[in-house]
Amino acid sequence: GVMVGERMEATEVGTPQGGNISPLLANIMLNELDWELEKRKLRFVRYADDCIILVRSQKAAERVMKSITRYIETTLLLKVNRKKSMIGRPTDIKYLGFTFYNQFKAKKYKAKAHEKSVEKVVRKLKQLTSRRWGVSNSVKAQKIAEVLRGWINYFKIGSILTVTRKLDTMLRYRFRMCIWKHWKTPQNKFRNLVKLGIGQKNAAKAACTHGYARICRTETVCYAMSNARLARFGLLSAEEYFVKVSS
């Protein structure tokens, strides 16, 4: 089958979408395209059938796109998907989950995670920190770490430091809500807050406060469940992990 938008459609011929054989066959078929681009002294990047060709002007881009499309279709006998083909500046491109931004001081473009890639990992992390998910918080921390490590190791060649900081802020807030729900009763919340160094007056006030979102933004809860304590519990810091693997 093949995914068309969000709908699965049956297919009788072809290779499975997302299978290991698809990029292998693409590399075999498009090896001659690489030679042709090198012969024309064009700068390009290709992964399987996804290719970017770099030129200096709009006019050159239009000329190259027309001639390379003709080469692919008449010489290689392959069909170019014109809906997915475009001419644009690096900042307009989404390539393998990345986009690019202009670093004016360095006078060059640099890679970063595309906003859709960030939105996708945020949705996944929100699922893993859902208060309705009936697993222990230690399991949640383990699953969060798996997702963060995979995502950061893939995007670490780009500028994602700001993104990792935002992910940490979101995850710590949502994880505090998970812990708060796990404590259940006001009595249990009071006892745990006192154990974590909160004075009895503030602990009693917090324990009787309604609303997860409200209480888990307070100074009392943020102090009791500090970043360091969450880390000791097993919640991975996206920023710290990114700095570690990118240095």
Spell out what each predicted region is.
Residues 1-247:
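Non-catalytic terminal/accessory segments
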